[in-house]
Amino acid sequence: MVDARLPDGSRVNAIVPPLAIHGSVLTIRKFARDPYTMDDLVGFGTVTPKAGQFLAACVRGKLNVLISGGTGTGKTTNLNVLSSFIPDGERIITIEDAAELQLQQPHVINLEARPPNAEGAGEVRIRDLVRNSLRMRPDRIIVGEVRGAEALDMLQAMNTGHEGSMTTVHANSPRDALSRLETMVLMSGYDLPVRAIREQITSALNLIMHLDRMPDGRRVVTALTELQGMEGDTILLQDIFKYRTMPGDGRLDGELVATGLRPKFLDRLAEVGVEIPAKAFRPPAPTNGAATPARLRTAKVPKMSTLARPERAR
């Protein structure tokens, strides 16, 4: 069994008998030569233009974002796209188990964890890299995925001046993502009360972007959810955008629409000069017919690059 990386950045996994009972298996995970943009995600039907502009504003306004979803839903791809809206002047540190992010800014430091050798020595964990990154004067920390105790260090980094940081987590819903984070923080070895963990989470995170994979293979954003604080021992969540399904063409179709609720963090964005027009949160008029499929509807939208992408330094 081996896990390796090719010169072009592709990931290779190979497993042979007797571990692979019916014969050797070689898996190659290739990446796009040119990183996807928000225009691409809109064209794929992953996100709507309104939601795309909202996400770009959240990144420029240095909100802390958690991307959640199941396996193969496009979490890393969307993390890479959101990271493209970080201004060029900021110092960014990326931390991954296996390097996949393709940030194009000039001040990016890429760190990669290292597994132990055959003798069980030499391991460098994601958690070790997160802790070390705090000594490297980052403006933002991007962790490819939190799977264990490093969740606590990531939350603490978000709470100690590293605003605008982002990461991903495997989860089935925004609420499930918070439960997963709680479990991972408890894996850190610190005997923290559950309420203290939840307060840490609500203080650190501003927005959850949740992705799902549709039965036809499309990957779509199904919720953009704000964390609004605590009520008793419960974390309050509010959907700003929500995927609305409607029957059409013999299968479920739908679109990501505004719920009509304005996020509390708008004032914070305004303080740093990032404005989101009120019409972005206006819900669509109710319709009696089926929703227009996102993959068809998005073919006529304007380019996001002229609306939301920050200027690159020349």
Where on the chain are the PLM-derived regions?
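P-loop NTP-binding catalytic core
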Residues: 1-61
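NTP-binding/hydrolysis catalytic cores, primarily Walker-type P-loop NTPases
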Residues: 217-314
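P-loop NTPase switch/communication element
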Residues: 31-43, 60, 80-131, 155, ...
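Walker A (P-loop) phosphate-binding loop of P-loop NTPases
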Residues: 72
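Hydrophobic anchor at the beta1->P-loop junction of P-loop NTPases
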Residues: 67-69
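Conserved lysine of the Walker
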Residues: 75
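Conserved P-loop NTPase nucleotide-binding/switch module
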Residues: 96-109, 133-232
